[in-house]
Amino acid sequence: MNREHAKAHLLLEALPYIRNFYGQTVVIKYGGHAMVDEQLQESFALNVILLKYIGINPVIVHGGGPQIGRMLKLLNIESQFKQGLRVTDDATMDVVEMVLVGKVNKNIVNLINLKGGSAVGLSGKDGRLITARKLEMVLERGDAPPEIIDLGKVGEVTGINTQLITTLLAQGFIPVIAPVGVDEDGETYNINADTVAGAVAAALGAKRLVLLTDVSGVLDKDKTLISSLDIKEASQAMADGVLVGGMIPKVSCCMEAVDAGVEKAHILDGRVENCIILELFTRSGIGTEIVCKRCQA
């Protein structure tokens, strides 16, 4: 089979997947190494543009932790973390918003547009896209009294303005969302990007939620990739201590999304070129899919 015939064969192999996703929404959380490596940045942009051109509606939510950390260091503002979340005082919040909304967001928008897409950058403040409230975190330690952890201006999502997103999608745009929210009094909050992506996917009734990470997916106790997890199995993996560290909030976010009606959630290695296409348009995929069998019954 020559190269041209092989290419035609590959396109035909993708047809069932394209048909399945046509007209559907896919929410992608963009973060990790894929945001800082130029080759991976280009691969990401082209994957997103391809989705749009074949009739799928991609919505991007991005992080920016390393970029925020570098700017805070440059400004001699000390970074503090509690339970894996950045403590965000007023000065830090100003930097977070400046970096996420003014720099990272616009860089992503510019890259997609340069590669032939039509992206529009948004923060949660635009059209009250993301409404939020202060995150209240309580840490329980055995018989000790519960400890209330004050993270400052770290928020949790209370609402998503889906009309704004669907209006942009209907006009052919690719929304790119910075995870900054606002409460009813106008206070600004720093929100975990995975959490925002999950909330956006659930609110939109998206077909898929995709989280890009710096690992191959969810690993078992032997460090072997788990290709598929039901939410019950995921809960058990947490209880058994199989899931640790930063993977816990990612899996929790996916579980909440599929429980709310998203068909599947995926955790992928963003360091792999074309990881989005490989996961969505091949039978085996390359990462971990999280499903709710009960919800689909």
Curated annotation (Swiss-Prot):
Transmembrane segments: none annotated. NCBIfam families: argB. It comes from the Bacteria. The lineage of its organism: Bacteria, Pseudomonadati, Thermodesulfobacteriota, Desulfovibrionia, Desulfovibrionales. SUPFAM superfamilies: Carbamate kinase-like. Pfam families: AA_kinase. Catalyzes the ATP-dependent phosphorylation of N-acetyl-L-glutamate. Its EC number is 2.7.2.8. Gene3D superfamilies: Acetylglutamate kinase-like. The keyword Hydrolase does not apply. Substrate binds at residues 64-65, 86, 190. Pathway: Amino-acid biosynthesis; L-arginine biosynthesis; N(2)-acetyl-L-ornithine from L-glutamate: step 2/4. The record marks 29, 250 as: Transition state stabilizer. HAMAP family: ArgB (MF_00082). One of its GO terms (molecular function) is ATP binding. GO terms for cellular component: cytoplasm. One of its GO terms (biological process) is L-arginine biosynthetic process. CDD domains: AAK_NAGK-C. The keyword Kinase applies. It is found in: Cytoplasm. It catalyses: N-acetyl-L-glutamate + ATP = N-acetyl-L-glutamyl 5-phosphate + ADP. This is Acetylglutamate kinase. Belongs to the acetylglutamate kinase family. ArgB subfamily. InterPro entries: AceGlu_kinase-like_sf, AcgluKinase_fam, ArgB, Asp/Glu/Uridylate_kinase, Glu/AcGlu_kinase, NAGK-C. The gene is argB. It comes from Solidesulfovibrio magneticus (strain ATCC 700980 / DSM 13731 / RS-1).
